[in-house]
Amino acid sequence: MAQKTPEETKAFLLEAFDTLFNRRDVEAAARFWSKDYIQHSAHIAPGREGLFNLVLAAPERLRYENDLVLVDGDDAMMHGRFSGNGRPRAWIAADRFRLKDGLLHEHWDVLQDEATADESKSGRPMFGDHFPA
């Protein structure tokens, strides 16, 4: 399979996240994630089924907003916000992926509760250009 351009990979990742996290369409999302998906997150059970089950069990209001996608060959990183996750605060996430055969094959993440304006020592929001309400 020919390697995607960085722009194609970015579009692929954004479509994958929208399909799974915003539309909650696990059946359609299966075309983005490898059957042999390797999960390194401490918050998600193994395999793509662990990820899909997590999303299906999450509140209906779960949403993903993307801020940045970086691509280097078969490695990619996304910076975004998961809101409506059933927690008091949205999670700001850095998700790292390894792609194989054009699919999401391996995943690592770093998650942090989004800080309010009162909590931010820098005085700047963690995501976007304004603090959460």
What residue ranges belong to the model's regions?
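C-terminal and inter-domain tail/linker signature
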Residues: M1-A133
